[in-house]
């Protein structure tokens, strides 16, 4: 057998089998849209559940006065103006429970507004 054949056969086989292995498909990342209503003196829904890794779009409205949408641990602090929608997007990277509060200080009832975001495994 010639040296060209000894070189050519392994080279051809290497390229032929290189395309046979397929990487497993990347896990599907979910994307969720959730409407949230802030009103005298409540946040609805009271609990929002999402899966770890999800791209979460919150569409927050208020039916009365200005509120603040604050989530400890997720670095979210957004004003929510009357009769407008505030869009908040975040990636749910870390499992756990996160408290949602109204960020308006000093107004009657604002400090009683609370909900929870739960990021599940």
Residue ranges of model-derived segments:
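Beta-strand-rich interaction surfaces with strong enrichment in secreted/lumenal proteins
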Residues: 46-48, 75-79, 89
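Short proline/glycine-enriched turn/loop motifs at strand-loop junctions of beta-rich domains
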Residues: 62-66
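N-terminal edge beta-strand
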Residues: 27-53
């Amino acid at each position: 057998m010639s040296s060209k054949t000894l070189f050519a056969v392994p080279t051809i086989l290497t390229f032929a089998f290189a395309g046979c292995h397929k990487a497993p498909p990347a896990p599907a990342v979910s994307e969720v849209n959730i409407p949230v209503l802030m009103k005298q003196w409540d946040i609805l829904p009271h609990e929002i559940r999402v899966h770890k890794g999800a791209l979460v779009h919150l569409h927050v409205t208020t039916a009365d006065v200005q509120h603040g949408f604050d989530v400890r641990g997720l670095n979210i602090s957004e004003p929510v103006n009357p009769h407008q929608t505030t869009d908040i997007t975040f990636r749910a990277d870390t499992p756990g429970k996160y408290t949602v509060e109204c960020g308006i200080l000093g107004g009657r009832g604002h400090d009683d507004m609370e909900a929870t975001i739960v990021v599940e495994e």
